[in-house]
Structure formats: C-alpha cells, structure tokens
C-alpha cells in the first residue's frame, strides 16, 4: 500500500488566472505579510498599479493606480503601506483616508509588518520601528552589523514581546549563496552576527516548566553542508529548566548541491518547523527534538515569499509561476507516518500527547495494558489521562480500576489515583463524573462535588443531576443547567419557588413546558407567586399559555383583582383576537367593582370588546357617561343624555362631538324640552363648541324656536367675535337690543366689520332706542353722515349732532357742515358749531364743502382768526390766498411774502385768473413743469429763460431742449440774448453749456460759446470754454478749427491735438504740436498719420534732436529702409532698439551695416545679446580673424549659443573656433565630423565623454567606413543598455554584421558589460554565426536575457540551443516539447530524463510516452521509472492497454506495483495470466489486494489450468464467497482447500454440507479430516447421526471423544464457580446493605433499601440510579 504522507499540500490560487502578469512574480514586486492578503505591483499599459488580492475573495482582486516603488498590506486589516523613494505613507483602504506619512533621511531597502500596528524599516545602515498609532515617528532600534554590508535583505523577524530582533540577508559568493544574520537584544542593546539563511522565533512550553521558553531557530547552508539550530535566547525564566540546544543536519539531495534555505515558519499549533529551500523542497521538523519528520520537493519553482497559514497551522507561499501553495501537518496521517515509516514510536507518542493527535492509539493501549498488568496503576493512569482523543477514558477503564484491590503498602485505591490524575489534567467526562461523585455523595461530601463543579472539572449530565438531587436540590439545578436538561431544570425551579426564572430559561433554551399545569399547581400553593408567574407567561409578544385557561384558573380561586391585573397586562397590545377576553374583563369588574371598570374604560385601553353589551351593563351600574360612550342608537342616547345633573359637563360637551349633526340637534331639543332652565347653560356650551358643524342658522332657529333670547345672546356672544357671518352679527345686535344690552350693541356696532350696515342702520332707526349712540356709530363708520344729520335734524335731536362732532368723530365736521347748509340751517349755528370743534378736522375738506356751495367767504373770520393764532397749516393759508385773489386784495404781495400756502394749489387756482400770479406762485414753490406749461401757454419765454438759467437743473434743461418741445427755438433765443448776458455766475454758464451739450445742439452751442468767449466778457480766457469751443467745432464745423487754433491761446494743446488726430485732422494736430514746440509728437504725426517720411526727414534735419532722429529711425526700420534706419540710429546715438535692428538686418542680410550699428551699440551698452550678434555678424561676413580676435578678448557674448547657430547654418569653421573657445568637446566632435576630421572628432568625443556624442561620432565613422574608429566609439556606447539597440540597428541596417559582432565580442571584457550585450551578441550569433552560439550560451547563459534569446534561437531553428536555454530558464515543459518536436537535433537521453521530472504539466508525461513508443521503445521502461513518482499510473496503464504495449512495459508495472494501484494490479495480473505464470499471479494477489477480486475470480474459474482455478477459489474465499469457493474446490477435487475454506468461513451449514458431500462419495478419510478441520463449527448430535447412518462411527470416534472431554471440563468449572459464589454470598450477609437491585421504571414504588414510612419524602426513583440494562456500574458493594 502507498505510504501515508504526514503533510497536506494544497494549491489555493494561480495568480495568472486572476489577471496578474507573470513578470510580476518576484521578491521586489510581490509581498505577502500574512495569509489574508497578497499585494502585487505591476504595470498595465504603462500605468503602475497595485493589485490587492483578498484570499477570502481571491477571484475579485482590487486594483489601484500608484506611483510607489513598494507596497505591503497589513497582516489583518485593509491598511496598506506605500513607499516612494524616501517617502512612506500608510492608507486605510476601507476608510479611503491617509493615516500616517513620513519622509526618511535614507532609502528604505526592506520593510515588513512585524505586528498588527508596527512596521519595521531597514535602511543601508540602521533598523527602525514605526508604530501606526498616534503621530510618532520611526524609532531607531539598532545599527546594521558590518557582516550585512553588501547583502540583500530578505527577512526581518522578532519574537512576540519584540525583545529579540533578527535581520536576515544573503550575498552571492563564487560557488554558493551565503547567509548573514544579525541577532539583537533590545534589553541588553547588543548584537551578534550569525551565519544563516532562514530563521524564526518560537515559544515552546516544556512539560516540567511553568513558563514558556523563547526559542531561536535558524538554518544555514555552508560550504560543508546544512544545519538546523534550535537554541533558547536570553536567560530562562525563574523556575524553568533551560532548553537543551539542538543542532541537526539538513539534508540536501545530490542534484541540489546549490540549494539553500530561503524561508522558515514555526507552527504554534503543532510545534513544528517548516523549512523551505530555494529549489522548492520542504523540510518538516519537530521543534522539541529537532527530528526531521519529512522532506520532499513541493515546487519546481522557487518559493520566494512565505507566511504562516493560520487556518491550518501550516505555511503558505508563492512561487515564481504565481502558484499560491500551502503545506500543513496532516493530523490523521502524521502519527501513523512517524510510527510506521520513521519507526520512532517515542516521537509519535510525544507528538500525539502534545498536540492531541490521533494515530497512536495502539501504542497507548499497549503501554497502558503493560503498566496495568504490571501493577503500576499510577503510571497506567497517567497514560490513560494523556492519551489523545480520550481513547482510554472509557467506562471499561474505570471498571478495570474498580475491580483491582488497593496494593499492599498503599492507602489510596487505584481508582482514586486514576481520578486524581484526571482531575489534575483537566475535566472529567460523563462516565468519570458519575463514578467519582457516587461514592463521594454516599459519604456525605457534597462540598467536594461543589468544588469540582466550580472548577469545571466535571461533565454535567442528567444522570449526574439525578444522582445529586437527592442530596442537594440547588446543586442538582446547577448541574441540570450546565447539562442542558430543560425539563429537570424547570422542575427544580418550580420546587425551589424560582418561578420568574422558568420563563426566561425556557425561552433561552427554546423549550416549551406545560405552563398551565405549572400555574395551577403554583396557584394551589402560593396564589401571590402564581399571579406573578401568570404575568410572566404573557409578558412576551406571543403568550406562552392560553390566556382563557389562565383566566379560568384565576376565577377558580375567585381572584378577581389579581385576574384584572393579569388581564390588563396581558391585553395591553389591544389585539382584535382578544375581544372576548376584553369583554370578560369588563364584565367581571362591572358586576363586582364598577369603579375599576370605569377606570379601565376611561383609559381607553381596549377597543375590541362587545360594546352594546358593556353599554347596558354600564347603565345598570349607574355609569351613564360610559353608557353614552358605547350607545349607538339615538333612542338610547336621548334617554340618557337628558340627565345632565348626573353627567360631567365637560365630558358631555365632548360627547356631542361624536354625534352626527342631526342627532346632536335632536338631543339639544330633547334637553331644552326636558328642562329649559336647567339645561340652557350646557346647551349654550355645546352650541358654542360645535356651531361650525351644527351651523349657526340651525342653532339660531333652535333658540328662537324656544323664544330664548337670553340663550341666543349668550350663544352668539361666544361666537360673534370670531364669526364672519353677517347674519350672526345682525342677530346678535337684535338679541342685545331685546335683552337691553345697549353697551354690547355699541361695542359690536363699533368693532364689527361683518354686519350689513344699511340693514343695521334701518333696524336702529326703527328700534327707537333712547340712546342714539349705536346709530351714530354705524352712520359714522359707514359714511351715512348725511343721512344721520338729516335724521337727527328732522327729529329735533340737534344735541346728538353736537355730541357727534364733539365726542364721536370731530373729523366729520366738514360733512356735517355741508349737510346743515343743504337743509338751510342758520349760518350762525354753523359758525358756532365750527368754533366749538377745535382743529380736529380737515381744513381742506371744510373749505371744499363750503367752496362747492359758493359760501367760502363764510369762513373768512374763522381763517383770519386761525392765522392770528399762529396757524401755519397750508390749507388755511391756501383758503385765504383764494379769498384775496378773488377779492383782488393785493394778491401778488401775499403770494411773494407768504411762506405757508401750497404753491401748486394756489398756482393752479390763478392760471385762468392771472398767469403772472401763477408764475409767481410756481416760481416760489419750484413747480418746474407747472411754470413751464404756464409760460409756454402764455408765451412768457423771457421769464422762462431767466428761470431755467437760475434753476440750474439738468433734467429740466433736457426736457425744454428736447425735440418734442415746439417752443425750443424761442426759448434758446431768449437764453442767448437775454438770460446769459444778464448773469455773472459761472455756475449758471456751466450748467447751461452742459445742458446744450447734453441736448446735442452743437451749432447752437457754438453760437452760445462765441457769444461768451469772442465777445469780450469775463469768461473770454476760460480754458474749459476754449477747449469746448474747439472740440465743438471739430464735431460740428471743421472749417472753423484752424481759425480757432490760431486765434485762441489758452486751451489744452496735447489733448486737443490728440482729439484732432482721432478725427483725421492731421494738419491741425501738426500745427498745434509745432505751435507749442512738441517736436517728437509733431514728427510722429508726419510719420504715423501723414505717412510722409521725406517731410519727416526734413523736419528732423531742421530740428536735429536725438529723440526726433530715433523716432525717424524706428519708422524707417519698420519700412525696411535698413541702411537709412541704421544711419538715423547712429545720428541719434541710440542703441536701444538693437533687438529690432538685428532682427530686420538679419532678414534682409545687411550684415555689413549691422556690424557698423553693433559696433556703435557695443560702445554704449555692453549687452550679451549685442556682442553675441556682433560675433555672428563677423561669421556671416567671413571676418574670422576679427571674430577670433574678439572672442579671445574680454566679452559677454553667449559663445555657445552662437556656435550652435553657426553649426546649424553650416558655418563649421566658425563653429569650430567657437566650440573650441568654450571647450564644448561634444559639439566640437560633431563639427569635426562634418569637416571630415574623424580622428580629431574621436579625440574630442573622448574629452566630452558623452554617450550621445559617442553615438554621433560612431555613426559618422560607420558611414565613412572608418570601422576602427567606429569600434573605439562603440565600446563607449554598448555599456549603456538604453543605447545598445540603436547602435545594433545602425550597423545592421547598413549590412556591417561582422564588424558589429567584432565590436560586441571586444566589449564583453569591459568592466561595465551588462546583460543586454551578451543577449544581443547571442541573437547576432543565431542569425549570422550559429556555430558560435552554443559556446557563447554555455559560457554566459546566466548573463543573457533568456526569453529574448529563446525567441531568436527558435526563429533560427537552433533546437539544441533552444532546449539548453529552456533548461536554464527552468521552462522544463517547453524544453521537453522542443526535444520531442526535434529529436534528431535536440534529444539526449540523460538530459531528457533529467528535465522530464521537473515539468509542471503532467500531460507531458503522456506525450513523452508516445514519443518513446515512436522513437525509443527499448528505453521506455527506464523513462517510465523516472516518471513514476508523479505519473497517474491508472491513465498510463489504460493507454498501454488501448495501444497493446502492456507486455513491453512489464518491468515498469513490476516496479510500481508497490503502490497497490488497481489499474497496475489488474494489468500485471492479466499479463501473468497470459504468460500462465500462476505462481507469479499468486504472489501478486497476496502482496497487492487493490483489484477487482470477483472479476478476476470469475475469469480464472474458467481457465483450463487447475492452478488458476485454484486461485479463483482462493479469491472467492478472500471475498467471503465461501460457498462458491468450496464448490470450486470440490469440482477440482481440491479437498484440502475445501476443508480449510469451510473452516475459515465459520458457517455451520457449509461445513455440514461438505461433510455430506464427502459421505455421498464414500470419502470417509476426508470425512474424518474435515471433522478435525471444522471442529468448532460442527454439532455433535449431527455428526453422531451421520456416522450412525453411514456406519462409520469409527471415523467419527476421535471427534466424539474430544467433544465429551470438553463438555466434562465445562461442567466441572461451573460447579467450581457456583461453590465460590455461594461462599461470597455468605461473607456479604454481614455487610451494611445500602441498596437492593431496583426496578427500572421511574414509576416504581418505594425503593428497596428505604423504609416505606420514609419513602414518601423522596422523589420517585430516588434510589434507583442504575446503568443501562439494569446492572449496577458502581463499586462491588453497591
């Protein structure tokens, strides 16, 4: 059979399947800090991304763009740390926030999470720890040891307390990879350098120690071999024994001589060490003993990153193919593996005990039996306690300890020793707990049981609770609770009175007891607790028992009050289904406690009871209010509602809100009918509250119908203030009048806005009230004053007129006066009335009323008296003015001197009477529009002009100067001729001029200004007016401009000139500039506007000013007159425009003139630009001597820039001088190339030492076929990988292959030779010199880019080299495919066999088989033996069977049959049958049982050879087909086999049938032999009968003698046992019999052993604790 493997190997994920690029599987781009996340950095379409793979959801990776050069995920949470050069950042991915950031002073070369919140940072010189918490910066822990200089840091570890730190690095030596480690103690602050490759810290607890030990495990591969060391670091804790150091060899296979450890992880779960090597081997070690448990190769590719696999206690890692692999201990197989394969039972026992692993059961059982048999009970007890999976902690073990006596010299029975050891180890199981507690309780030591329970040493069970219950009910309850026996727990709660806990417990454990039964029993014993228990039963949303049954129980005990409380709590949710219970609750209380029922109904707790029934019960109980709440029939309501003295008034008012409108009115009628006086007040309250619903009209009709004006008044008084209904207000006024509430009539007439005033006025007239004040109020409010005056005057109520104007509303006096005048009242009465009312009315209105009736003079005395009193009211003075105007009493003087009248009113009054007076009034009041209108209408333009000039109002001017004014011309004439000539105020002039300008009247404005300026006046020299005159002329009449310019002197010349230019008056502008000697501006006009350079030149010569020459030069330069411009600049001695001059001269190539200008400019300004351009001009004019002389002297020129320009323009000689001057050898080299001076170019390139320069010189040399110089240049280019491709392409494109190869060959020896050079040379060999490629690859395969060379070799069909590269690149699959595709060139037997074992794709095994069958059939078996460890043998055998090549591979089948594979066994068995090798077939069947036994047997039983049929019988026997087996033996007369198979079958019928078959053939000797063979199966009576029938008793006699002997012996033993039992019974009669064998029914009567008189105090079955089957399982005395 196949050996068990101690490990489980699993592939969790293939990273390429989730979209990760294979180029990203490397130590620098992939990190895995734990088994939860994998973090990969890769480039996708030139975009750097980080891919985060959550191993719990591996198929959905998260991608984020980043610019960092390293990323590591936190071991537990979605927190990522990013590093970009010296900048470190920590981000929370879920919160999308940055947690921390820091910039280091050094580059971080390695970093790692060492805990959930701490990062370790390793630089070139130091190690730091950076906490994720708070704002702390990285803390330096220690400096790197010198032994780690130049090493690649691959790991950093620390122990759990972070007191021991370890830094691990590796470095390449000539023949191996060396490892260096630095171990640092934080406490002691010291370091130790150690040689090692992989290490880890671990915590291990030695059996004898109290505290765990900190171990340091590390592995190293030196030149002599590998070692694993396990040592304790630091001093052992107090009381601990030190850990013995361990050092064992690490085996490395011969084919992995360069292998070395790369990773180590320690499993805390199994205390094992997982060691991973570079070649993919795993080594599994036991940490305590350093024993190697298992070693094998798990990956053909390097596993470059690992982490602990927490779920399985193993190790997880990623290899270079992107496989995520894990290895862990196989709990089921490791112990059998150690025991059977390693033959190390001690280690198997140790690991099984330490880690509670199965597989060593037989070892423990044998050891236990051995110690027990030897009487070493304590040691045997320890073995039983330590055995894994509790395999020995069984009832049988307890029984064995019970059966042994206490050894001599010992006071403790073995059983108690066993229990003591178990208690020390931990918790007892169910059987152990029972057997320990039984004698303890019998001895009355229940406190021990309590102690063990508190310490959780006992396993609680129902049986244990039953056992304890007789001694302590509370303790039993605790046991039942822990054992989860709900029925017993609830029974205990009930017996101890803890009813409140029953419901909570039942809900907690989801158990439903018979609550009704429990409640009934509680009620009998304790009604108060029963009520509480009942409430608990309905406390939840769903009641735990039927509420009706609970109520019945309450009523059985006449507990109405408690039942009420219960139902109130139970029915609090007011569900429709509880209607009957609600009715029952109210009914019982209405009959026994109406007040309680009233309170319940008052709280409105229930809504689903029988309302009609409850209403009748309420009325009978005298609860009329509740009855009304429940009645729905109007007859019932009217019967009850009239008894208002028995009802609460507020409630009754609210009750009417529940009735319909019709029912409410009917009830109100009934109440008023029954007792008007008594019920009126409540009816008014109801009507007031519900008047909106019952309608005011209906309620008014109701009260009027009963002629109850008091009720109507009170009702309306409560709503009138809020009602908008006119009828309500009118009815209220009527009711108030009829109830003599005159004050209320006054109030409502004064305040209400809702009544019909005409209707109320008529009602009050008809009412003939003694007090006319309400009528006065109505007429005053609604403007019926005229009617009021007529009514009062005609009814001789004049005193109320005086009252009205004096007390009610004096402001109505004008209307009253008008009314009195209309009724021809005496003037004296009216005057007196006016005098009585002192100024509380409008004078305007009074004047208006009197004026309308042409009686204005009536007011003259009163008006004059008011004036004399000092009245300044405009109305008074307006009236006097009107009177004076009408009477022509010096009105103009009054209008000019009086300051109180309203000008607009009086002016309007005078317009038709005297326009002059109207103008006076309007002018006094600044009534602009009115005055203009009067002047226009009456042709008073002179007055209007004077007014406008003096008014100075721009808006008013704009109005009169607008085109819409038909009188504008007449007005302007008066303004020019009269108004302006009269004024001396400049503001009047200014506003008038502005008004003309605003009105856009230029001609009129010129006329105006000429009048002011040219006619001698005080404003003739006014600068602004002169400016305005010229500007207006420019705008309106340009012919006058030149005349004004010459005549006027005091104007702003520059501004006027610029305005003239903007209006194309260039000569006028030139005349202004020339008149005022502004020559620069004057020539600018000639240049820019007149555009006449000749006049400008003449003007410049006449002026001869530098500024004028500069402006002229600039204009000439813009016109392209370079020579003239330069001459002008030289005359001006102005170098300021040197940039423009250089630009224009360069364009027209006027270099000689430019030299003259720049020489002048250089004297004035030593600018770099001027000198640079002068150098360039020298070069352009060919004056190289001047150029060389210039640059050799001091200068500020940018020679480099000019050199570049000369080079670009092909002036290489000048460029050569310039580059040489500034030592720019790079550009000088290129210049010399163009001058064909190649040697000089190479020398300059050497001085420049620039890659670009080397390239350009090299390419030029190649083009000139100067290959020696080109090679000299090329050697400086090829060392730069980025430039190599361009160089190669340049050579190849021109066909210089040999020269290129020679260049690369000579470059291989350079110190800076890199991979690209070796790679490109290999590619060139493949294309042009394939014979040299193999030698090149064998020398430099490690320095070439293998994928690139692979493609080249494949393109060149160099199959042998292709295989060689595949092998070195570890692409074994492709190597094998290439060998098989091109066997004549690529296949080599040894090489093929070596590579085929390393392939990842097992399918290649079967392609290899086909290949060998086609090409190398004789070597097939050798190859199959190589493939055997990983091949699917079933598939292989199936293939060979189909193709008919099974005989060819028989040696292979023999070699792998040890695997006990079914297909192999059947195939080999078939070959042996074909070869008739029955002995080989028998050996195969005995050695390997994994095949179809029945099919083979059926095949063989028809074989022509007896031996094969014999094997068929043997197979039938092996498969328990005894009958077929024996029949086949009988058929072939194989009697011995038949007898043996019959005996082995253990079947009586087969043996007896065989005996009968022998007797049928008279084979008596076989009969006798079968009796001996099948002795145990045969019945003596049957044998005796057969012998007697066939007369062969002699043949049966030996059998019968033996049977008789056995029976005699058995009888003797029975007699001996019986005698011994009787003796033991006699000895036990004197002992205290505790208990007899009980009945096994829980309903049994008093137990035997308990007196009947005391049995009633025990629960049923209290003394009947027995094991299943009725047999006592306790001590013998039980």
UniProtKB/Swiss-Prot annotation:
Gene Ontology biological-process entries: chemical synaptic transmission; compound eye development; compound eye retinal cell programmed cell death; endocytosis; extracellular matrix organization; intracellular protein transport; liquid clearance, open tracheal system; oocyte microtubule cytoskeleton polarization
Keywords (A to Z) from UniProt: Coated pit, Cytoplasmic vesicle, Membrane, Repeat
The keyword Aminoacyl-tRNA synthetase appears for this protein: no
Pfam families to which the protein is assigned, alphabetical: Clathrin (PF00637), Clathrin-link (PF09268), Clathrin_H_link (PF13838), Clathrin_propel (PF01394)
Broad class of the protein's primary localization: membrane
Region described as WD40-like repeat 2: spans on this chain: 68-107
Region of interest: WD40-like repeat 7: 302-330
Region ranges (WD40-like repeat 4): 150-195
Placement of CHCR repeats on the sequence: 538-684, 687-829, 834-973, 980-1125, 1129-1270, 1275-1421, 1424-1567
Family: Belongs to the clathrin heavy chain family.
Subunit field text: Clathrin triskelions, composed of 3 heavy chains and 3 light chains, are the basic subunits of the clathrin coat. Interacts with sau.
PANTHER family cross-referenced by the UniProt entry: CLATHRIN HEAVY CHAIN (PTHR10292:SF1), CLATHRIN HEAVY CHAIN RELATED (PTHR10292)
Domain notes: The C-terminal third of the heavy chains forms the hub of the triskelion. This region contains the trimerization domain and the light-chain binding domain involved in the assembly of the clathrin lattice. The N-terminal seven-bladed beta-propeller is formed by WD40-like repeats, and projects inward from the polyhedral outer clathrin coat. It constitutes a major protein-protein interaction node.
Name this polypeptide is given: Clathrin heavy chain
Record lineage: Eukaryota, Metazoa, Ecdysozoa, Arthropoda, Hexapoda
Gene: Chc
């Amino acid at each position: 059979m196949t050996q068990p493997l101690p490990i489980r190997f699993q592939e969790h994920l293939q990273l390429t399947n989730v979209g990760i690029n294979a180029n990203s599987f490397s130590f620098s781009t992939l990190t895995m800090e734990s088994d939860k996340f994998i973090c990969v950095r890769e480039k996708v379409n030139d975009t750097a991304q980080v891919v985060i793979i959550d191993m719990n959801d591996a198929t959905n990776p998260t991608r984020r763009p980043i610019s960092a050069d390293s990323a590591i995920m936190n071991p537990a949470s979605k927190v990522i740390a990013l590093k970009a050069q010296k900048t470190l950042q920590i981000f929370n991915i879920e919160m999308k926030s940055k947690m921390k950031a820091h910039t280091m002073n050094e580059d971080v070369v390695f970093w790692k999470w060492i805990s959930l919140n701490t990062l370790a940072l390793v630089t070139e010189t130091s190690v730091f720890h950076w906490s994720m918490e708070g704002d702390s910066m990285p803390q330096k822990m220690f400096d790197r040891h010198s032994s780690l200089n130049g090493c690649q840091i691959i790991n950093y570890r620390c122990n759990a307390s972070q007191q021991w730190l370890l830094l691990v690095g590796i470095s390449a030596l000539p023949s191996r990879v060396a490892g260096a480690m630095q171990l640092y103690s934080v406490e002691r602050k010291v370091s130790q350098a150690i040689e090692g490759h992989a290490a880890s810290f671990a915590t291990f607890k030695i059996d004898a120690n109290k505290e765990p030990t900190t171990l340091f495990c590390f592995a190293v591969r030196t030149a002599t071999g590998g070692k694993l060391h396990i040592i304790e670091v630091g001093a052992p804790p107090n009381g601990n024994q030190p850990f013995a150091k361990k050092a064992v060899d690490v085996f490395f296979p011969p084919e992995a001589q360069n292998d070395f450890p790369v990773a180590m992880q320690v499993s805390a779960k199994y205390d094992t060490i997982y060691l991973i090597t570079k070649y993919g081997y795993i080594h599994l070690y036991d940490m305590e003993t350093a024993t190697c448990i298992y070693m094998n190769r798990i990956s053909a590719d390097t596993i470059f990153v690992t982490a602990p696999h927490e779920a399985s206690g193993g190790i997880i890692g990623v290899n270079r193919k992107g496989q995520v692999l894990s290895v862990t201990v196989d709990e089921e197989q490791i112990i059998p593996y150690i025991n059977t394969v390693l033959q190390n039972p001690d280690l198997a026992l140790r690991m099984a005990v330490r880690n509670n692993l199965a597989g060593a059961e037989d070892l423990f059982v044998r050891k236990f039996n051995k110690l027990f048999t030897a009487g070493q009970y304590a040691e045997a007890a320890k073995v039983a306690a330590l055995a894994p999976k509790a395999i020995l902690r069984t009832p049988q073990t307890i029984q064995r300890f019970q059966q042994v006596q206490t050894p001599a010299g010992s006071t403790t029975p073995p059983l108690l020793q066993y229990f003591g050891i178990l208690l020390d180890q931990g918790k007892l199981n169910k059987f152990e707990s029972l057997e320990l507690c039984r004698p303890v309780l019998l001895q009355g030591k229940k406190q021990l049981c309590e102690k063990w329970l508190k310490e959780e040493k006992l396993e609680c069970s129902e049986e244990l609770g039953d056992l304890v219950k007789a001694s302590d009910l509370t303790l039993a309850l605790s046991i039942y609770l822990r054992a989860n026996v709900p029925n017993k727990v609830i029974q205990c709660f009930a017996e101890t009175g803890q009813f409140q806990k029953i419901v909570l417990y039942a809900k907690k454990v989801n158990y439903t007891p018979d609550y009704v039964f429990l409640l009934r029993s509680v009620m009998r014993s304790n009604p108060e607790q029963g009520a509480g228990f009942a409430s608990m039963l309905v406390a939840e949303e769903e009641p735990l028992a039927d509420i009706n049954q609970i109520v019945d129980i309450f009523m059985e005990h006449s507990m109405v009050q408690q039942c009420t409380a219960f139902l109130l709590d139970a029915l609090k949710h007011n569900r429709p289904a509880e209607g009957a219970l609600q009715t029952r609750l109210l009914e019982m209380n209405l009959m026994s406690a109406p007040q309680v029922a009233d309170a319940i109904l008052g709280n409105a707790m229930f809504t689903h009871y029988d309302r009609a029934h409850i209403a009748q019960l309420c009325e009978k109980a005298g609860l009329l209010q509740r009855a009304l709440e429940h009645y729905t029939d109007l007859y019932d309501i009217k019967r009850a509602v009239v008894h208002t003295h028995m009802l609460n008034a507020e409630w009754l008012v609210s009750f009417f809100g529940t009735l319909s409108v019709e029912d409410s009115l009917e009830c109100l009628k009934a109440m008023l009918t029954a007792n008007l006086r008594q019920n009126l007040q409540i009816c008014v309250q109801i009507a007031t509250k519900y008047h909106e619903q019952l309608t005011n009209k209906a309620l008014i009709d109701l009260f009027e119908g009963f002629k109850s004006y008091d009720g109507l008044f009170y009702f309306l008084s409560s709503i009138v203030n809020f009602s908008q209904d006119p009828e309500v207000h009118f009815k209220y006024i009527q009711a108030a009048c009829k109830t003599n509430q005159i004050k209320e009539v006054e109030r409502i007439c004064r305040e209400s806005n809702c009544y019909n005033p005409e209707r109320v006025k008529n009602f009050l007239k008809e009412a003939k009230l003694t007090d006319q004040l309400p009528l006065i109020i109505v007429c005053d409010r609604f403007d019926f004053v005229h009617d009021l005056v007529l009514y009062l005057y005609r009814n001789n109520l004049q005193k109320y007129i005086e009252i009205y104007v004096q007390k009610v509303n004096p402001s109505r006096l004008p209307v009253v006066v008008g009314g009195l005048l209309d009724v021809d009242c005496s003037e004296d009465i009216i005057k007196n009335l006016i005098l009585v009312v002192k100024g509380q009315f409008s004078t305007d209105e009074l004047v208006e009323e009197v004026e309308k009736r042409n009686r204005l003079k009536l007011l003259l005395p009163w008006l004059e008296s008011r004036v004399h009193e000092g009245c300044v009211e405009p109305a008074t003075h307006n009236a006097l003015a009107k009177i004076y105007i009408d009477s022509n009493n010096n009105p103009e003087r009054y209008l000019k001197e009086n300051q109180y009248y309203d000008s607009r009113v009086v002016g309007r009054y005078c317009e038709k009477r005297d326009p002059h007076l109207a103008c006076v009034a309007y002018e006094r009041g600044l009534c602009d529009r009115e005055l203009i209108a009067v002047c226009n209408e009456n042709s008073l333009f002179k007055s209007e002009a004077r007014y406008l000039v003096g008014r100075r109002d721009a808006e008013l001017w704009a109005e009169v100067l607008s085109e819409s004014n038909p009188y504008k011309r007449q007005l302007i004439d008066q303004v020019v001729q009269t108004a302006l000539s009269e004024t001396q105020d400049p503001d009047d002039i200014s506003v008038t001029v502005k008004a003309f300008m605003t009105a856009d009247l230029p001609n009129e404005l010129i006329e105006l200004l000429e009048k002011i300026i040219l006619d001698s006046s005080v404003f003739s020299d006014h600068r602004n007016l002169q400016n305005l005159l010229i500007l207006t002329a420019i705008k309106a009449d340009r012919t006058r401009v030149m005349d004004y310019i010459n005549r006027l002197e005091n104007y702003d010349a520059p501004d006027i000139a610029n305005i003239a230019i903007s209006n194309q008056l260039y000569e006028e502008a030139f005349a202004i500039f020339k008149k005022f000697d502004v020559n620069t501006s004057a020539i600018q006009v000639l240049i820019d506007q007149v555009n006449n350079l000749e006049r400008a030149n003449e003007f410049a010569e006449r002026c001869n000013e530098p500024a004028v020459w500069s402006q002229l030069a600039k204009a000439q330069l813009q016109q392209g007159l370079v020579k003239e411009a330069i001459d002008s600049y030289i005359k001006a001695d102005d170098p300021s425009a040197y940039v423009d001059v250089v630009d224009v001269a360069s364009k027209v190539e006027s270099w000689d003139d430019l030299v003259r200008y720049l020489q002048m400019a250089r004297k004035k300004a030593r600018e770099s630009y001027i000198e640079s351009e002068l150098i360039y001009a020298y070069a352009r004019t060919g004056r190289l001597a001047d150029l060389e002389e210039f640059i050799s002297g001091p200068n500020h020129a940018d020679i480099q820039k000019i050199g570049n320009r000369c080079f670009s323009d092909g002036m290489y000689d000048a460029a050569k001088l310039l580059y040489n001057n500034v030592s720019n050898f790079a550009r000088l080299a290129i210049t010399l190339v163009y001058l064909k001076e190649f040697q000089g170019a190479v020398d300059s390139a050497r001085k420049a030492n620039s890659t670009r320069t080397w390239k350009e010189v090299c390419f030029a040399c190649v083009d000139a076929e100067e290959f020696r110089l080109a090679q000299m240049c090329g050697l400086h280019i090829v060392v730069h990988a980025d430039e190599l491709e361009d160089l190669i392409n340049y050579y190849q494109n021109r066909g210089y292959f040999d020269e290129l190869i020679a260049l690369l060959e000579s470059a291989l020896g350079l110190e800076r030779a890199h991979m690209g050079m070796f790679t490109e040379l290999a590619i060139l060999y493949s294309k042009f010199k394939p014979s040299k490629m193999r030698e090149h690859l064998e020398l430099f395969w490690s320095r070439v880019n293998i994928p690139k060379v692979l493609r080249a070799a494949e393109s060149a069909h160099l199959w042998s080299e292709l295989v060689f590269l595949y092998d070195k690149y570890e692409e074994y699959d492709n190597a094998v495919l290439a060998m098989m595709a091109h066997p004549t060139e690529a296949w080599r037997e040894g090489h093929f066999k070596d590579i085929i074992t390393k392939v990842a794709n097992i399918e290649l095994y079967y392609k290899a088989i086909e290949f060998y069958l086609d090409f190398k059939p004789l070597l097939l078996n050798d190859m199959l033996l190589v493939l055997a460890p990983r091949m699917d043998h079933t598939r292989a055998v199936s293939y060979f069977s189909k193709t008919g090549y099974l005989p060819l591979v028989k040696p292979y089948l023999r070699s792998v049959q040890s695997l006990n594979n079914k297909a192999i066994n059947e195939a080999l068995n078939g070959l042996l049958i074909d070869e008739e090798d029955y002995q080989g077939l028998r050996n195969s069947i005995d050695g390997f049982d994994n095949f179809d036994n029945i099919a083979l047997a059926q095949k063989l039983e028809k074989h022509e050879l007896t031996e094969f049929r014999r094997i068929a019988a043997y197979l039938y026997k092996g498969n328990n087909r005894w009958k077929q087996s024996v029949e086949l033996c009988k058929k072939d007369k194989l009697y011995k086999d038949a007898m043996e198979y019959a005996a082995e079958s253990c079947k009586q019928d087969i043996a007896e049938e065989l005996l009968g078959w022998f007797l049928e053939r008279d084979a008596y000797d076989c009969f006798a032999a079968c009796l001996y063979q099948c002795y145990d199966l045969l019945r003596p009576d049957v044998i005796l009968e057969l012998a007697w029938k066939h007369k062969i008793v002699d043949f049966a006699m030996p059998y019968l003698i033996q049977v008789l002997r056995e029976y005699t012996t058995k009888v003797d033993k029975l007699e001996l046992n019986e005698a011994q039992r009787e003796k033991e019974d006699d000895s036990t009669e004197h002992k205290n019999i505790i208990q007899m064998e009980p009945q096994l029914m829980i309903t049994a009567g008093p137990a035997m052993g308990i007196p009947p008189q005391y049995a009633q105090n025990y629960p049923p079955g209290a003394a009947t604790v027995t094991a299943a089957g009725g047999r006592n399982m306790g001590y013998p005395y039980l």
